[in-house]
From Swiss-Prot:
This is Diaminopimelate epimerase. It is an enzyme of class 5 (isomerase). Pathway: Amino-acid biosynthesis; L-lysine biosynthesis via DAP pathway; DL-2,6-diaminopimelate from LL-2,6-diaminopimelate: step 1/1. Catalyzes the stereoinversion of LL-2,6-diaminopimelate (L,L-DAP) to meso-diaminopimelate (meso-DAP), a precursor of L-lysine and an essential component of the bacterial peptidoglycan. Substrate binds at residues 11, 44, 64, 74-75, 157, 190, 208-209, 218-219. Keywords: Amino-acid biosynthesis, Cytoplasm, Isomerase, Lysine biosynthesis. The record marks 268 as: Important for dimerization. It comes from Serratia proteamaculans (strain 568). InterPro entries: DAP_epimerase_AS (IPR018510), DAP_epimerase_DapF (IPR001653). Belongs to the diaminopimelate epimerase family. It catalyses: (2S,6S)-2,6-diaminopimelate = meso-2,6-diaminopimelate. Its EC number is 5.1.1.7.
């Protein structure tokens, strides 16, 4: 099986073309491939499939390192767009894809950045899903004997965003896994720790569902900005500084889609016998 290794700001992926190859990934195989000592090693596996709708170009599937399939990965979406052009699967600059839960448009810019229309953030607890009696801008939660205030949003996948004074000293290792598997998140969640530098600049660390803390999380950056704008703490355009690099997020507010722009890097191509 041929594959490519790619990353978006250090969030690394194994990308596989299932348009021209016949492939099947069991959870066990994905876990074996994800092992950084015994396999290829990655945060997520991205699979390019033929479209289910003639109006679309591809179907985009995402699997975490633990073998679970998820509906959204923003950094992966940028790498997906770069991959299909590099491999000659399309020469379009605006690439329309379906995911497990919806549709996306991935646009490759002249300077080889990728702008992703992530759709409109959804704060409805039932959609996230998040157990709450009504929609709030801020929720109070108990985790690891701490009381935390957080915002909750779906970017096609569930996110919980906490505001912290300093991302360097944030209790990511303590609170991340506890909140990820909290009973109020029936499908688990990605946990963002956001430090607001100014209305146009935040620093962010993300503990990803099924992967742990990563160098960058695109949908997590989108979620943090969406929550910050909802809470009237951030402007419409925000520079998001992650451990692996920076993203530009733009959202005009309710009724509008959110856009994420950033790089996608091809590292190497490989072949593995399964």
């Amino acid at each position: 099986m041929q594959f490519s290794k790619m990353h978006g700001l250090g969030n690394d992926f194994m990308v596989v073309d299932a348009v021209t190859q016949n492939v099947y990934f069991s959870p066990e195989l994905i876990r074996r491939l994800a092992d950084r000592h015994l396999g290829v090693g990655f945060d997520q596996l991205l699979v390019v499939e033929p479209p289910y709708d003639p109006e679309l170009d591809f179907h985009y599937r995402i699997f975490n390192a633990d073998g679970s399939e998820v509906a959204q990965c923003g950094n992966g979406a940028r790498c997906f767009a770069r991959f299909v052009r590099l491999k000659g699967l399309t020469n379009k600059r605006d690439i329309r894809v379906s995911t497990q839960t919806g549709r996306m448009v991935l646009s490759v810019t002249d300077d080889d950045l990728v702008c992703v229309n992530m759709g409109e953030p959804n704060f409805d607890p039932q959609t996230v899903p998040f157990r709450a009696t009504k929609e709030e801008k801020t929720y109070i939660m108990r985790a690891a004997e701490h009381t935390v205030l957080c915002g909750v949003v779906s970017m096609g996948n569930p996110h919980c965003v906490l505001q912290v004074d300093d991302v360097k000293t944030a209790k990511v290792e303590l609170l991340g896994p506890v909140l990820e598997g909290h009973e109020r998140f029936p499908e688990r969640a990605n946990i963002g720790f956001m430090q607001i530098v100014s209305r146009e600049h935040i620093k962010l660390r993300v503990y990803e569902r099924g992967a742990g803390e990563t160098q960058a999380c695109g949908s997590g950056a989108c979620a943090a900005v969406a929550v910050g704008i909802q809470q009237e703490l951030l402007s419409e355009e925000v520079h998001v500084e992650l451990p692996g690099g920076s993203l530009h997020i733009r959202w005009k507010g309710p009724g509008s889609p959110l856009f994420m722009t950033g790089p996608a890097t091809h590292v190497y191509d490989g072949f593995i016998h399964l």
